[in-house]
From Swiss-Prot:
Function: One of the primary rRNA binding proteins, it binds directly to 16S rRNA where it nucleates assembly of the head domain of the 30S subunit. Is located at the subunit interface close to the decoding center, probably blocks exit of the E-site tRNA.
Stored Pfam families: Ribosomal_S7
Species whose genome carries this gene: Kosmotoga olearia (strain ATCC BAA-1733 / DSM 21960 / TBF 19.5.1)
Entry keyword annotation includes Cell membrane: no
HAMAP family given in the database record: Ribosomal_uS7_B (MF_00480_B)
Family indicated by similarity: Belongs to the universal ribosomal protein uS7 family.
Protein known as: Small ribosomal subunit protein uS7
């Protein structure tokens, strides 16, 4: 175990939209350290999202992310030999990273199209409140709702 909590690293905003959120998405999409390739994929996807939604790319992107961010999640806790799934509120930074992770995972799971197109389609679905990433969020919320009876075990 650590003596102290690890310090959060500052993420530099991206050069085009000047936004930290876009940089985080680029870092999530990046494979094997190929950042320039990841940047191309993300910027193309944001353009496609903007065209489809008829909104500025950052507005549409932020709405899509907010539609995927979970508010609650469950964590296992052992109480007297039984393991209960206990609902916890999700901190803002974790909610954001989970949302990005789910969107990228859902985009990668699609097949038969270029990655930028798959990412754009998943972002459009998230913007509209549909899609795999939004379904994942609803599943997590459903599990939290089911474990509501054990919420008093939080400590």
């Amino acid at each position: 175990m650590r003596r102290r909590r690890a310090v959060k690293r500052e993420v530099a905003p991206d050069p085009i939209y000047n936004d930290v959120l876009v940089t985080k998405l680029i870092n999530r999409v990046m494979k094997d350290g190929k950042k320039s390739k990841a940047e191309k994929i993300v910027y193309k996807a944001l353009e496609m999202l903007s065209e489809k939604t008829k909104q500025p790319p950052m507005e549409a992107f932020k709405k899509a992310i907010n539609n995927v961010k979970p508010l609650l999640e469950v964590r296992p806790r052992r109480v007297g030999g039984a393991t209960y799934q206990i609902p916890f509120e999700v901190p803002e930074d974790r909610a954001l990273s989970l949302a990005l992770r789910w969107i990228v995972a859902a985009a990668r799971a699609k097949s038969g199209r270029p990655t930028s197109e798959r990412l754009a389609l998943e972002l459009i679905d998230a913007y509209n409140g549909t899609g795999v990433a939004v379904k994942k969020r609803e599943d997590v919320h459903r599990m939290a709702e089911a474990g509501k009876a054990y919420a008093h075990f939080r400590w």
